[in-house]
UniProtKB/Swiss-Prot annotation:
Its main location: periplasm. Mo-bis(molybdopterin guanine dinucleotide) binds at residues 81, 148, 173, 177, 210-217, 241-245, 260-262, 370, 374, 480, 506-507, 529, 556, 716-725, 800, 817. One of its GO terms (cellular component) is membrane. Catalytic subunit of the periplasmic nitrate reductase complex NapAB. Receives electrons from NapB and catalyzes the reduction of nitrate to nitrite. The keyword Membrane does not apply. This is Periplasmic nitrate reductase. Residues 37-93 form the 4Fe-4S Mo/W bis-MGD-type domain. [4Fe-4S] cluster binds at residues 44, 47, 51, 79. Its cofactor is [4Fe-4S] cluster; Mo-bis(molybdopterin guanine dinucleotide). It comes from Haemophilus influenzae (strain 86-028NP). Coiled coil: none annotated. GO terms for biological process: cellular respiration; Mo-molybdopterin cofactor biosynthetic process; nitrate assimilation.
Length: 827
C-alpha cells in the first residue's frame, strides 16, 4: 500500500483517536478507519504561534486532530496542548442554554441560575443596557473582549459598540498581555506588529529571550530554535529571566536578574554600544530620530494612591524632541559596575550580552513575551529593545530583528488589527483623530459624528468604574477575567456583585467569571463556527465550521448580531445624526450595521458545497465574507492590506500586507516590502518622514517591592500543560492528570529559613489577599532566593487575589510579574 505523507499523518491521527477512546484497530484497518473521518484544516485554539492542524470529524463530533504537515508555521508538529484539541469541546459541564439569576421567575441579583430562552436573555440584557445608558450615559456599558475571538467576532463587537452604541468602552484581554507591545510599536514605528517573521529563526546567529519561557509557552517555535542551535555550533542562545525555567536548558548563557532591572540592563547595552563605537551611523542617520520620554509617570493606580501623588501621570505618554547627545548623557550612568549591582548579574554576563548585540557580523533576534509586557514600564522596555536594534541596524532583515511574541491565537488579528481597544479603530486608526473617525463612518455608512472622539475605559478602569457605580453593565466574551485579572478581591468582584450592576458572561463553560455573573450565555467554540485568527507574524488564517455546537449554544458572532436587533437608532442616536440620514429612523442596529448592503451582499450560494455555517444560514447571507471584506477596506492601500476573502480558505495563511496576491515576510525593507520604494533601502512608513524613534528613558522602580513584612517577590505565569485559566485544558483528562493543581515554586534555602519543606501546604499572602497552595522546591521552575513563582490556571487557587492592579501608565497593561508577598505554613 502506498501512502502519501499527508495520508500517513491522517492515518496516525485516526489511530490516536481510537487509542484515546480505548479501542484497538488492526494496522490493516487504519486507512479504512481514516476514510470514515472527514478532514479539514483549522488553526490551533491556544497560543499566538498559529499552528495549523488537521481536524477529523465523524458523526458530528471532532474525533481527531493532527499537526498539518503542509503548514509553514509548525510543519506537522503540535505541542502537548495541540494534540488534545479534540477534547477541549467535550467537557462534562459544557453549557448548553442561557442561565439567568432568578427568584420566582424574575431576575434577582442574589438568585440562583435558572435556564431561560435566548429571547428572554436578550430582553433582560436590553432592559439593563437601556437603564444604564439613561442613568450614566454612553459609557455606562462596557465590553471586555478577547484575543481568542475570531476576527469577525472582534470586528462585530467593535462595530456594535463604537457605531451602534456610540461608546468606545471596548477592551480586549490583550490589554493584560500585549498592550505594552502594541503601544511601543505605534510609538516607535507609527504602525503596530512585528516587522519580521518566523523565517528569521532559520537564518539567525543568535537568539536573546527577554522575559520569555518559549520552551513551555511557544514550544513549536522553540523546537525550531532548538533545531537551529543544535544544527549549527556557532549559533548562541541567551535567556534572561527573573527565575530559571525550562528555556535555560538550551541556553548558552542563562541570566537571572532582579525584577525591574531589565530597564537598567538595556540602558547599559546602549551605553556599551556608544562607548565602543558600535553604532551603525549610516542606518541611524538615515532612518531614525531621537526622542526623550516623560519620567516619573506613576503606576496606573487610583489617583488618590500615594504613589500617584506628584507624578506626571497626565502626560505619561508624551515624547519630547531630543538628540543622540541627550541619549548618550542619559545612558552614561548605566555603567557595568552600577548595573551589575542593580541587576545581580556579574560584569562578564553583562559584557558578553552587550558584545553580542555590538558584533556587526552577528544576526540577532530578540524575543519577548510577558516579562516585558506585564511591566509598569512595559512600553519603555519594548522601546529600549527597539533602540538596541535600531542603533545597530539589526532590524527588518532576514535573521535579524526584535520580535514580540503573542500569547493568544488572535491577539494580533482580532485585538490589535481589528482595533478592539477603547482608543482604536481597524488598521491602526484611532478614535481621537477626526480623519480616522471619518474613514470609519464612510466605510460603515454612518452619519458624520457617529463615532465618539472620547477614548473609552480600559479593563482596569472598567473594574474601578463598576466598583464606583459609574459603569453599570459589563458583557464579557471569550475570556475569564475574574480569574485572570489582577486584584480580584478589592476591585473586580465587588464591582460585579454591586447592586444595580449587571454582568453578562458568554462562555462554553461555568468558569469563575461565569459563576460570578448575572447572566451566562452558552457559546460555540473553535470549529463549531467559521473562524479566522491572526498570529504573531502577521499571518491571517481561516477555517470552516466543522461540527455544530451542543444544545442552544451560539457563537459570539451570532449573539452580537442578534442582540443588535433589540435596539433602534431612535433609542441610541441623537436627532442630529438621524437628520443627516433620515432613512435610518426606526431601523434596528442590526439593520444599520449588519444588513447594510455591504455585510449582507454575499449570498449563501458562495458557501462551499456541504459547508456548515450556522450564522450564515440563520441570517440568510454569507456573514463572514461580508464582515471581512468590509473590514479589509480599512487597511488596503495603507500598509495593512489583506488578501481577498476566498484566498485564505485556499492557503495556509498569508502575512500582511498582501499586495497583488503576494505576502510580505519582512516589512520596511526594500526588496521585501512593496511599500518601500526603489532606492529607499529602509522606510519606516508608519511616520510621514519614514523614520523610527529612538527613545531615551531611565530606570524607574516597581510599584511594590519586598519589605520586612512581605519579604518575597511574587511572579506569576504559566506551565506547558495548561493555558491561561485552564478553562479548556483542565477539561482534558490527560492534561489535568499531568498537572492537576497549581504550585508555588521557592528556592530551597528560602523554604528552609521558614521551616518549610517540599510538598508542604502553605499560605501565600499579599496586601490584597491570600491563597492556599503547595510548595515546590525541586520542580521545573527554580526561583532565586527572595522570589517565588506561581501560575493562575487553577480555579481552586486564585493567584490573582494576590496581585496588584498597577499598570504601565502609557499602555494600561497590568504588571503581573512583581508584587510583594509572604509565605508561611498553612494551618
Amino acid at each position: 500500500m502506498n501512502l502519501s505523507r499527508r495520508d500517513f499523518m491522517k492515518a496516525n491521527a485516526a489511530m490516536a483517536a481510537a487509542t484515546a477512546a480505548g479501542l484497538t484497530i488492526p494496522v490493516k484497518n487504519v486507512v479504512a478507519a481514516e476514510s470514515e473521518i472527514k478532514w479539514d484544516k483549522a488553526v490551533c485554539r491556544f497560543c499566538g504561534t498559529g499552528c495549523a492542524v488537521l481536524v477529523g470529524t465523524k458523526d458530528g463530533r471532532v474525533v481527531a486532530s493532527q499537526g498539518d504537515p503542509d503548514a509553514e508555521v509548525n510543519r506537522g508538529l503540535n505541542c502537548i496542548k495541540g494534540y488534545f484539541l479534540p477534547k477541549i469541546m467535550y467537557g462534562k459541564d459544557r453549557l448548553t442554554q442561557p442561565l439567568l439569576r432568578m427568584t420566582n421567575g424574575k431576575f434577582d441579583k442574589n438568585g440562583d441560575f435558572a435556564p431561560v430562552s435566548w429571547d428572554f436573555a436578550f430582553k433582560t440584557m436590553a432592559e439593563k443596557f437601556k437603564e444604564a445608558f439613561k442613568k450614566n450615559g454612553q459609557n455606562a456599558v462596557g465590553m471586555f473582549s478577547s484575543g481568542q475571538s475570531t476576527i469577525w467576532e472582534g470586528y462585530a463587537k467593535n462595530k456594535l459598540w463604537k457605531a451602534g452604541f456610540r461608546s468606545n468602552n471596548v477592551d480586549p484581554n490583550a490589554r493584560h498581555c500585549m498592550a505594552s507591545a502594541a503601544v511601543a510599536f505605534m510609538r516607535t514605528f507609527g504602525m503596530d506588529e512585528p516587522m519580521g517573521c518566523y523565517d528569521d529563526i532559520e537564518q539567525a546567529d543568535a537568539f536573546v529571550l527577554w522575559g520569555s519561557n518559549m520552551a513551555e509557552m511557544h514550544p513549536i517555535l522553540w523546537s525550531r530554535i532548538t533545531d537551529r542551535r543544535i544544527s549549527n555550533p556557532d549559533v548562541r542562545v541567551t535567556v534572561l529571566s527573573t527565575y530559571e525555567h525550562r528555556s535555560f536548558e538550551l541556553a548558552d548563557h542563562g541570566l537571572i536578574f532582579t525584577p525591574q532591572t531589565d530597564l537598567a540592563i538595556m540602558n547599559y547595552i546602549i551605553n556599551y554600544l556608544i562607548q565602543n563605537n558600535a553604532i551603525n551611523w549610516d542606518f541611524v542617520n538615515k532612518h531614525t530620530k531621537f526622542k526623550r520620554g516623560e519620567t516619573n509617570i506613576g503606576y496606573g493606580l487610583r489617583p488618590e494612591h500615594p504613589l500617584e501623588k506628584d507624578t506626571n501621570r497626565a502626560t505619561a505618554g508624551k515624547m519630547h524632541d531630543s538628540s543622540f547627545e541627550e541619549l548618550k548623557q542619559l545612558v552614561s550612568e548605566y555603567t557595568v559596575e552600577k548595573v551589575s549591582k542593580m541587576s545581580g548579574l556579574d560584569k562578564v554576563q553583562l559584557e558578553t550580552l552587550a558584545k553580542l548585540y555590538a558584533d556587526p557580523t552577528k544576526k540577532v533576534v530578540s524575543y519577548w513575551t510577558m516579562g516585558f509586557n506585564q511591566h509598569t514600564r512595559g512600553v519603555w522596555v519594548n522601546q529600549l529593545i527597539y533602540n538596541i536594534h535600531l542603533l545597530t541596524g539589526k532590524i527588518s532583515i532576514p535573521g535579524c530583528g526584535p520580535f514580540s511574541l503573542t500569547g493568544q491565537p488572535s491577539a494580533c488579528g482580532t485585538a490589535r488589527e481589528v482595533g478592539s481597544f477603547p482608543h482604536r479603530l481597524p488598521a491602526d486608526l484611532v478614535v481621537t483623530n477626526p480623519k480616522h473617525r471619518e474613514t470609519a463612518e464612510r466605510i460603515w455608512k454612518l452619519p458624520k459624528g457617529t463615532v465618539s472622539e472620547k477614548v473609552g475605559l480600559h479593563t482596569i478602569a472598567q473594574d474601578r468604574a463598576m466598583n464606583d457605580g459609574e459603569m453599570n453593565v459589563l458583557w464579557q466574551m471569550c475570556n475569564n477575567n475574574m480569574q485572570a485579572g489582577p486584584n480580584i478581591n478589592q476591585e473586580r468582584l465587588p464591582g460585579w456583585r454591586k447592586e444595580g450592576n449587571f454582568v453578562i458572561v458568554s462562555d462554553p463553560y461555568p468558569t469563575v467569571s461565569a459563576l460570578s455573573a448575572d447572566l451566562i450565555l452558552p457559546t460555540a467554540m473553535w470549529v463549531e463556527k467559521e473562524g479566522a485568527y491572526g498570529n504573531a507574524e502577521r499571518r491571517t488564517q481561516f477555517w470552516r465550521q466543522q461540527v455544530k455546537a451542543p444544545g442552544e449554544a451560539k457563537s459570539d458572532l451570532w449573539q452580537l448580531m442578534e442582540f443588535a436587533k433589540y435596539f433602534t437608532t431612535d433609542e441610541m442616536w441623537t436627532e442630529d445624526l438621524l437628520t443627516q440620514m433620515p432613512e435610518y429612523r426606526g431601523k434596528t442596529l442590526y439593520e444599520v450595521l449588519f444588513k447594510n448592503g455591504q455585510v449582507d451582499k454575499f449570498p449563501l450560494s458562495e458557501l462551499a458545497e456541504g459547508q456548515l455555517n450556522d450564522e450564515s444560514e440563520y441570517f440568510g447571507y454569507y456573514v463572514h465574507k461580508g464582515l471581512f471584506e468590509e473590514y479589509a477596506e480599512f487597511g488596503r492601500g495603507h500598509g495593512h492590506d489583506l488578501a481577498p476573502f476566498d484566498m485564505y480558505h485556499k492557503a495556509h495563511g498569508l502575512r500582511w500586507p498582501v499586495v497583488e496576491g503576494k505576502e510580505t515576510l519582512w516589512r520596511y525593507r526594500e526588496g521585501y516590502d512593496p511599500y518601500v520604494k526603489e532606492g529607499e533601502g529602509v522606510a519606516f512608513y508608519g511616520y510621514p518622514d519614514k523614520k523610527a524613534i529612538i527613545l531615551a528613558v531611565p530606570y524607574e522602580p516597581p510599584a511594590e517591592s519586598p519589605d520586612n513584612e512581605y519579604d518575597l517577590w511574587l511572579s506569576t505565569g504559566r506551565v506547558l500543560e495548561h493555558w491561561h485559566t485552564g478553562t479548556m485544558t483542565r477539561r482534558v483528562p490527560e492534561l489535568h492528570r499531568a498537572f492537576p493543581n497549581n504550585l508555588v515554586w521557592m528556592h530551597p534555602l528560602d523554604a528552609q529559613a521558614r521551616g518549610l519543606r517540599h510538598g508542604d501546604k502553605i499560605k501565600i499572602s499579599s496586601r490584597r489577599g491570600e491563597m492556599i497552595s503547595y510548595l515546590d522546591t525541586r520542580g521545573r521552575n527554580k526561583p532565586p532566593r527572595g522570589l517565588v513563582f506561581t501560575t493562575f490556571f487553577d480555579a481552586g487557587q486564585l493567584a490573582n487575589s494576590l496581585t496588584l492592579d498597577a499598570t504601565d501608565p502609557i499602555s494600561k497593561e497590568t504588571d503581573f510579574k512583581k508584587c510583594a508577598v509572604k509565605v508561611e505554613k498553612a494551618a
